[in-house]
Amino acid sequence: MAAPGRPARETAAAPGPGRPTCRDAASRTKKQKKKTRDGASVANGSGKTPEKQDPKEAPLSAEAQAEQLARELAWCVEKLELGLKMQRPTPKQKEQALGAIRTLRSQRTPLPRKRQLMRSLFGDYRAQIEAEWREALQALRTAAHSAQVQPVGEAARKKSRRVCRPRPEGRSKGTSDTRDEEFRFNFF
């Protein structure tokens, strides 16, 4: 049923074995996200751009990216080396791990190849690094909490078999330091 002055829409044929049932992905994304003249993206028709972005999604500087990549590479190499030391790999696994270590440490290997290799070996290695970091932080917090010196209450002091009494200030210690004599051992 076409409106007057407009041509009728074409209907898609019934989906066959090789035809997708939903619209083309490109046309779907065009309808979901439109660009304004100044280049800011507008989603769902609202004309406002988000004022604050998530700090994790903010682009990092070149130095920060290089530092993060170095940490990721070091983590992956460390995991591979630990796997070689702690497990009993087959010769094929050992050769594969050594080749991966060599590739990750190489200065000639391009960065996309290193990232691809890390993802193929470890899956989502960034999430694993983050989880490991959180576990280490939690362990440090619990260790710091258990290491704190807590004052002993009055009830605990009363239970103790040791009697703690303040010394009178007039008495001196068992060894007297008042003599000015030179110290000598009495071996003879």
UniProtKB/Swiss-Prot annotation:
Region annotation (Disordered) ranges: 1-65, 87-112, 144-182
Keywords attached to this Swiss-Prot or TrEMBL record, sorted alphabetically, are:
Acetylation, Phosphoprotein
One Pfam family linked to the record? DUF4615
Disulfide bridge positions per record: none
Q: Which residues carry this modification: N-acetylalanine?
A: 2
| Record field: compositional bias (Basic and acidic residues) | 166-182
Modification Phosphoserine, positions: 41
Its family remark reads: Belongs to the UPF0488 family.
| Protein name listed in UniProt | UPF0488 protein C8orf33 homolog
Source organism of this protein record: Bos taurus (Bovine)
Q: What is the lineage of its organism?
A: Eukaryota, Metazoa, Chordata, Craniata, Vertebrata
